[in-house]
Amino acid sequence: MTPTACATVSTMTSVGVRALRQRASELLRRVEAGETIEITDRGRPVALLSPLPQGGPYEQLLASGEIERATLDVVDLPEPLDLDAGVELPSVTLARLREHER
């Protein structure tokens, strides 16, 4: 194995583009097993090959704390506010503005 083909740095494996092409199936199996692999081009890191996060976008946002689960049921939500007379809904305003663009 040549130094640029594949090397382990700390706990991450570093693989050159050529080695990636030659050993793609093997490397993908390792990624599926949870390993992250650094891809290099002429010794310069250019990408990381890593496993996909578990769950969909909603679960990922929950796990990261960016969103929280709803605490109310939809049936418990308050009724929409009545608009004052003469106030136009934003959707109506947008449709009117787009009409002039045509």
UniProtKB/Swiss-Prot annotation:
One GO biological process term: positive regulation of growth
InterPro entries: Antitoxin_Phd/YefM, phD-YefM_TA_antitoxins, YefM-like_sf
Domain of life: Bacteria
Pfam family, one: PhdYeFM_antitox
SUPFAM superfamilies noted in UniProt: YefM-like
UniProt entry tagged with the keyword DNA-binding: no
Keyword annotations: Toxin-antitoxin system
Regions annotated as coiled coil: none
GO function term, MF aspect, one: toxin sequestering activity
PANTHER family: ANTITOXIN VAPB46 (PTHR35377:SF5), ANTITOXIN VAPB49-RELATED-RELATED (PTHR35377)
Protein purpose: Antitoxin component of a type II toxin-antitoxin (TA) system. Upon expression in M.smegmatis neutralizes the effect of cognate toxin VapC46.
Similarity comment: Belongs to the phD/YefM antitoxin family.
Annotated protein name in UniProt: Antitoxin VapB46
Organism: Mycobacterium tuberculosis (strain ATCC 25618 / H37Rv)
